[in-house]
Amino acid sequence: MNKLRSSAITQGVQRSPNRSMLRAVGFNDEDFNKPIIGVANGYSTITPCNMGLNKLALKAEESIKRSGGMPQMFGTITVSDGISMGTEGMKYSLVSREVIADSIETACNAQSMDGVLAIGGCDKNMPGAMIAIARMNIPSIFIYGGTIKPGKLYGEDLTVVSAFEAVGQLTSGKITEERLIQVEKNCIPGAGSCGGMFTANTMSAVIEVLGLSLPHSSTMAAEDLEKELSADKSAEILVSAIKKDIRPLDLMTKKAFENAISVIMAIGGSTNAVLHILAIANTAGIDININDFERIRQKVPVICDLKPSGKYVTVDLHKAGGIPQVMKILLNAGLIHGDCKNIEGKTISEYLQNIPDKPPTNQNVIRDIHDPLYKKGHLAILKGNLASEGSVAKISGVKNPVLTGPAKIFESEEDCLKSILNNDIKAGDVVVIRNEGPVGGPGMREMLAPTSAIVGQGLGEKVALITDGRFSGGTYGLVVGHIAPEAAVGGNIALIKEGDLITVDAVKQLIEVNLSDEELKKRKKDWVKPIQKYKRGILSKYSRIVSTSSLGAVTDL
């Protein structure tokens, strides 16, 4: 084992005052020669995603001690995307990714910690922790709080998206208010992150593929015993990694990020993975850009039938073999790199050695590579005169991802949702929600409420929705987000007028408004930059420093 970083606060006569403080929190003489390991605990009762984390943190703490380390627990924040969705509060969601990253980096570096075990549940916990881990490059491991089990109503599996869609179903007369309340009361049965292949489960899978969490751990249910056992094992592995000096940037290679992109395509993951992978890779100093997603999408099929557009939930994926089974199928097809290593020092080829070559025959969640749901990945990168830097379209569940129609312009999510619920949106429309980007929102809110209402009204195949904001992992339909440049910085999405014809063509990777360059230039001359909405506080700071979404909406370029 190399010299411990914590020796800066534990060794030598001059560090006697430092040691006195450590003795007060439980250190004894022999402990000053042990690695000090931060336990970044995202426990919170704000959200079901994080309410089960404390037991995992305590289990990990015990395991660190038993394995020869000294744990020091500290808290990180979380917000609940599901609770803040559709409100002003959602502007703080993406901002919280940076706060989480900054807080973990601050605590670990201020206290000269030798390693960190991060525990998270809700969407931004995972990328926030990974950004911090990449910045510090000290031995690290991530423990995912686990997925929620599906709710049940009359034999049907429910998720939180069921409740969002029920709102649209109610306003279009498809269900009664009584049914809406039944869905509301039954869709979230306990602890864990939203149960489909939404953002939290997508990002936990990304971390598993990158090698910074244990195999199979990203799809475990939050309330199952194996999740606690996995936390115990993760802590033990981290202590070993410190002794072996295995560091995050040893694992976060370009090949590893390509593997992660391949897996999110195969499992039908969230559009948010594009934003977060770009941010993590940027921090790690790895050259991954938005075009890599399109390149990989062209060759990797969707082989998992998972919600929101599919049938099954993440616990079903776990029973079918989890992420290792998906990876083994992709490895055999030559679609991922087998020489990338994980936190245990094993290559992908090594730790997948005992995974079956084909998915189990008694399940329908994971398909064979030759019988995919879709022959190409579902996250398409679209460019054109509305998105010269790129945009992200999610096209799973859409039979024909091509639509040309008149623009219906909204300057906020709230105005759009009101119009949808008033049945003002018709088949063939292209709904435009702008000034919701990283700078303009600020915070790049997720448009789950409008998209779910559209689907609930039966228009998911007949209407396109485009925005410089984001989408929840629970969104599906013909949707295009992350449009860059965004409206607030003068992107062409700011120049569209009501009724302009817009084409969304995921087959040709095209998004454009039917206007000449001359007309766009003329409109740009008349464009007035919006007044900054916030003068003080975190949203004001964020809007001044955040990058474009095509670079991951990072704050430390």
Curated annotation (Swiss-Prot):
InterPro entries, A to Z: DHAD_IlvD/Edd, Dihydro-acid_dehy_C, DihydroxyA_deHydtase, DiOHA_6PGluconate_deHydtase_CS, ILV_EDD_C, ILV_EDD_N, IlvD/EDD_N
SUPFAM superfamilies: IlvD/EDD N-terminal domain-like, LeuD/IlvD-like
Catalytic-site annotation from UniProt: S472
Catalysed reaction equations from the record: (2R)-2,3-dihydroxy-3-methylbutanoate = 3-methyl-2-oxobutanoate + H2O; (2R,3R)-2,3-dihydroxy-3-methylpentanoate = (S)-3-methyl-2-oxopentanoate + H2O
Molecular function terms, GO-annotated: 2 iron, 2 sulfur cluster binding; dihydroxy-acid dehydratase activity; magnesium ion binding
Top EC class for this record: lyase
Residues that, per the record, bind [2Fe-2S] cluster: C49, C122, C194
Pathway info: Amino-acid biosynthesis; L-isoleucine biosynthesis; L-isoleucine from 2-oxobutanoate: step 3/4; Amino-acid biosynthesis; L-valine biosynthesis; L-valine from pyruvate: step 3/4
Alphabetized UniProt keyword annotations: 2Fe-2S, Amino-acid biosynthesis, Branched-chain amino acid biosynthesis, Iron, Iron-sulfur, Lyase, Magnesium, Metal-binding
Entry binding sites for Mg(2+): D81, D123, K124, E446
Highest taxon listed in the record's lineage: Bacteria
Cofactor: record remark: Binds 1 [2Fe-2S] cluster per subunit. This cluster acts as a Lewis acid cofactor.
EC number: 4.2.1.9
A GO BP entry: L-valine biosynthetic process
The protein's role, per its UniProt record: Functions in the biosynthesis of branched-chain amino acids. Catalyzes the dehydration of (2R,3R)-2,3-dihydroxy-3-methylpentanoate (2,3-dihydroxy-3-methylvalerate) into 2-oxo-3-methylpentanoate (2-oxo-3-methylvalerate) and of (2R)-2,3-dihydroxy-3-methylbutanoate (2,3-dihydroxyisovalerate) into 2-oxo-3-methylbutanoate (2-oxoisovalerate), the penultimate precursor to L-isoleucine and L-valine, respectively.
UniProt similarity note: Belongs to the IlvD/Edd family.
Name of the protein: Dihydroxy-acid dehydratase
Organism: Prochlorococcus marinus (strain MIT 9301)
Source taxonomy: Bacteria, Bacillati, Cyanobacteriota, Cyanophyceae, Synechococcales
